[in-house]
């Protein structure tokens, strides 16, 4: 894992937006991942009024969805919440949590956006570019874009459109539940991202990697 996900960023919001534009140009939107043996989910929570960032990573068997390992790290939060710059607040802890897993996953599911972002660099895309890992963003809400009416059944999906471009899919993971916003992060195609998410959905609305990471990240010591 990289020492820093931010390169020579000057620490300002304006500089962060410029870096997002640069890194977005490195995103690979084609399937470039191995046969999946290990997958991971990552999510972030906060403690002490946002002063501590708590990141969880869960490693699973891609075939059985059984949990193989998990890690939870807590570090001081280094940046306030700024819309559109979430990865600058969360990635340092996420990278440490992934580094503490005993093995490197073949694919990482992130609780958050992939390219479905104003500058095409949500946390999943940012993580993928700086780590080199294939990533998918699985968000609970739309950050940008619009979509056509969505069917009510499991597996129904429609494109998420933004400024004439498809940035992801609005996906119904279970019958008559609120949809997920699925977008590729890095080294995963627009077509494959929803399929890979659905392969990890069991009894719950969220796919197992992010559901389990969310549960771990929400757990306080």
From Swiss-Prot:
Q: Which reaction does it catalyse?
A: Endonucleolytic cleavage at apurinic or apyrimidinic sites to products with a 5'-phosphate
What residues does Mg(2+) bind to?
43, 111
Q: Does the keyword Electron transport apply?
A: no
Its cofactor is: Mg(2+)
Location of this chain's protein in the cell: Cytoplasm
Instruction: Return the GO cellular component terms, semicolon-separated.
Output: cytoplasm
Main location, first listed in the record: cytoplasm
A molecular function GO annotation: deoxyribonuclease V activity
The enzyme's main class, written as a single word, is: hydrolase
EC number(s) given by UniProt: 3.1.21.7
Tell me where on the tree of life, at the top rank, the source sits: Bacteria
What role does this protein play?
DNA repair enzyme involved in the repair of deaminated bases. Selectively cleaves double-stranded DNA at the second phosphodiester bond 3' to a deoxyinosine leaving behind the intact lesion on the nicked DNA.
GO terms in the biological process aspect are:
DNA repair
Q: Record's Pfam families?
A: Endonuclease_5
Protein name (record) = Endonuclease V
Keywords from UniProt, A to Z, are:
Cytoplasm, DNA damage, DNA repair, Endonuclease, Hydrolase, Magnesium, Metal-binding, Nuclease
Indicate the family of this protein. Answer: Belongs to the endonuclease V family.
Task: List site positions: Interaction with target DNA.
Answer: 81
Keyword Ribonucleoprotein in annotation: no
């Amino acid at each position: 894992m990289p020492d820093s996900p931010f390169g020579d960023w000057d620490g300002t919001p304006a500089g962060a937006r410029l870096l997002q534009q640069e890194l977005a140009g490195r995103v690979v939107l084609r399937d470039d991942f191995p046969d999946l043996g290990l997958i991971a989910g990552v999510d972030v929570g906060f403690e002490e009024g946002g002063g501590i960032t708590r990141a969880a990573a869960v490693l699973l068997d891609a075939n059985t969805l059984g949990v193989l390992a998990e890690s939870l790290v807590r570090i001081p939060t280094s940046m306030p919440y700024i819309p559109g710059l979430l990865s600058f607040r969360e990635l340092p802890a996420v990278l440490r949590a992934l580094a503490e897993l005993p093995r490197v996953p073949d694919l990482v599911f992130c609780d958050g956006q992939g390219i479905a972002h104003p500058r095409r660099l949500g946390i999943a895309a940012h993580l993928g570019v700086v780590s080199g890992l294939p990533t998918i963003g699985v968000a609970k809400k739309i950050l940008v874009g619009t979509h056509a009416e969505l069917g009510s059944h499991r597996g129904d999906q429609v494109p998420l459109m933004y400024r004439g471009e498809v940035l992801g899919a609005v996906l119904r993971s279970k019958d008559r539940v609120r949809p997920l916003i699925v977008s590729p992060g890095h080294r995963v195609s627009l077509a494959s991202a929803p399929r890979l998410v659905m392969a990890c959905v069991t009894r719950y609305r969220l796919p197992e990697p992010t559901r389990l990471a969310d549960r771990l990240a929400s757990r306080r010591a």
